[in-house]
Curated annotation (Swiss-Prot):
Organism (species): Halobacterium salinarum (strain ATCC 700922 / JCM 11081 / NRC-1) (Halobacterium halobium)
Similarity field: Belongs to the GatB/GatE family. GatB subfamily.
The entry's keywords: ATP-binding, Ligase, Nucleotide-binding, Protein biosynthesis
Entry protein name: Aspartyl/glutamyl-tRNA(Asn/Gln) amidotransferase subunit B
Enzyme class: ligase
Cited InterPro entries: Asn/Gln-tRNA_amidoTrfase_suB/E, Asn/Gln-tRNA_Trfase_suB/E_cat, Asn/Gln_amidotransferase, Asn/Gln_tRNA_amidoTrase-B-like, GatB, GatB_C_1, GatB_Yqey_C_2, Gln-tRNA_amidoTrfase_suB_CS
SUPFAM superfamilies associated with the record: GatB/YqeY motif, Glutamine synthetase/guanido kinase
A Pfam family: GatB_Yqey
Listed GO MF terms: asparaginyl-tRNA synthase (glutamine-hydrolyzing) activity; ATP binding; glutaminyl-tRNA synthase (glutamine-hydrolyzing) activity
The EC number(s) this enzyme carries: 6.3.5.-
Catalyzed reactions per annotation: L-glutamyl-tRNA(Gln) + L-glutamine + ATP + H2O = L-glutaminyl-tRNA(Gln) + L-glutamate + ADP + phosphate + H(+); L-aspartyl-tRNA(Asn) + L-glutamine + ATP + H2O = L-asparaginyl-tRNA(Asn) + L-glutamate + ADP + phosphate + 2 H(+)
Length: 495
């Protein structure tokens, strides 16, 4: 590596094409069900989604409403009229030989989505968002896309409504991309148009170039000349927030190393290999002209202006976070955790309205989410247990068990063994110990630890904590720590 090459100060320019499957009962241009997760291959198909001659598409109104909701959420321009085009290319998962999509008149244009914290926020530009149909899915048998023995095609997915969201090249690091995707999917989930838990519901194509940092000086982002001069690599097969961060971190490093060695970066499409943690060259990158777009004659232009104002949107994550801060007194970091997923926010609000808001925030944001994250689960995976989480918080709020036992024993056992809170409390004898039993444990702790008693009288602060721990151990953690502390002080004053 030459000294001159090693001194180059390079910055990544990253833009995204995010494909999200919309939550509709039927496909975008036919009446086939989209509920295909457990279906046998090629059983949710019809002449329309198989592209048979003479089959005519009928636009799904629910998909259009979902797109309008997103447009409102990102403050995009929703034109009065939109239309569809055919994007022509050959691939086995596309039975018609073209994809019905939108080209020069997308349903949403010029929006933005804010990311970051309350003290450090910035807007990511969204150039456009348009509707299109999902292709079928490929199953590579005996290997990956590079070395499979053969590939099978399942057309159950063909025709599932997709929203493609195209950002401006506003990202400079892989971590920013992950943050944006988390925020975007949260907004879509709040809108009720996206199921984050559904396999394959999110797919990301990322375009990345490396340029000299000096070319990015000033405001307004990279100029058109800078973007034109930089060879752009597209990375496909990204299916999660985490994969996006890994893939772009790898690709940034790969391109940086090539440029610093004086090598050119090819304009190509690369495949993210999740198992190996690398991107692999697939083909030279297509240009827009390669797709030979022309209007879809079987779907007339769509007039959106007549009814777009009648489509409501619910409270979104940012507004809900701010309301949690003002209405419940929750800190910004905790409020962000609580509103990151709609199911989490709903659980917190239900508990906060019934019990103490601070207790509810601690339990949901720290205890429940922390335990689920440790198990690589989400609240959706245990959605049928909301009543049990509420009962556990009630036991703590009503002073029936200690917070320590609730977190360290009951919650973990609930998740490990699929048992109800009351059953665990009874079986493990975790009900709070009180009255004479606590007084006896206090007396025993004082009698058995004369050195700690002496240290307490000598002003050693840790001595009291030690004695509290001894009492808690004798009661199996079921005594109230505050009561134990008070009883110990009273008894030690007389010792």
């Amino acid at each position: 590596m030459s000294a001159q090459a090693a001194e180059r100060d390079l910055t990544a320019i990253i833009g995204l094409e995010v494909h999200v499957q919309l939550e509709t009962d039927t496909k975008i241009f036919c009446g086939c069900s989209t509920d295909t997760d457990d279906a046998d291959p090629n059983t949710h198909t019809c002449p329309v989604c198989l592209g048979l001659p003479g089959a005519l598409p009928t636009l799904n109104e629910g998909a259009v409403e979902a797109a309008v909701k997103l447009g409102k959420a990102i403050d995009a321009d929703i034109p009065e009229r939109t239309r569809f085009h055919r994007k022509n290319y050959f691939y086995p998962d596309l039975p018609k030989g073209f994809q019905i999509t939108q080209y020069d008149a997308p349903i949403c244009q010029d929006g933005e989505l804010e990311v970051g914290t309350a003290d450090d926020r910035r807007a990511i530009g969204i150039e456009r968002a348009h509707l299109e149909e999902d292709p079928g899915s490929l199953q590579h048998v005996g290997g990956s896309i590079e070395d499979a023995d053969y590939t099978l095609v399942d057309y159950n997915r063909a025709g599932t409504p997709l929203m493609e969201i195209v950002t401006r090249p506003d990202f400079r690091a892989a971590e920013e991309v992950r943050s944006f995707l988390a925020k975007l999917t949260s907004v879509l989930e709040y809108l009720g148009v996206f199921d984050a838990e559904r396999d394959g519901s999110l797919r990301v194509d990322a375009n990345i170039s490396m340029v000299d940092s000096a070319e990015l000086a000033g405001e307004g982002g990279p100029s058109d000349d800078v973007l034109e001069a930089a060879n752009r690599t597209e990375v496909k097969n990204i299916s999660s927030h985490r994969a996006a961060q890994k893939a772009l971190a790898y690709e940034t490093t790969r391109q940086r190393n090539q440029l610093e060695r004086g090598m050119a970066v090819a304009q190509e499409t690369r495949h993210w290999d999740e198992a190996r943690g690398v991107t692999v060259s697939m083909r030279s990158k297509e240009e827009e002209k390669d797709y030979r777009y022309f209007r879809e004659a079987d779907i007339p232009p769509l007039e959106v202006s007549d009814w777009k104002d009648e489509i409501p949107i619910p409270e979104l994550p940012d507004a809900r976070r701010e309301r949690f801060r003002t209405e419940y007194g929750v800190g910004d970091e905790t409020a962000s955790k609580l509103t990151s997923r709609k199911a989490v926010a709903d659980l917190f609000e239900e508990l906060a309205d019934e019990y103490d808001a601070a207790l509810a925030a601690t339990w949901v944001a720290d205890n429940v989410l922390g335990e689920l994250n440790y198990r690589d689960l989400s609240l959706d995976d245990v959605a049928d247990r909301d009543d049990e989480f509420e009962r556990l918080v009630e036991l703590v709020a009503e002073d029936e068990i200690t917070a320590k036992n609730a977190e360290e024993v009951v919650l973990r056992t609930m998740l490990d063994e699929d048992r109800a809170p009351d059953e665990i409390v009874d079986a493990e004898g975790l009900g709070k110990t009180s009255g004479d039993a606590v007084a006896d444990a206090v007396a025993e702790a004082i009698a058995e630890n004369p050195d700690a008693v002496a240290d307490y009288h000598d002003g050693e602060g840790d001595a009291l904590n030690f004695l509290v721990g001894q009492v808690m151990a004798k009661t199996g953690g079921s005594a109230d720590p505050g009561q134990v502390n008070e009883l110990l002080r009273d008894e030690l004053a007389q010792a």
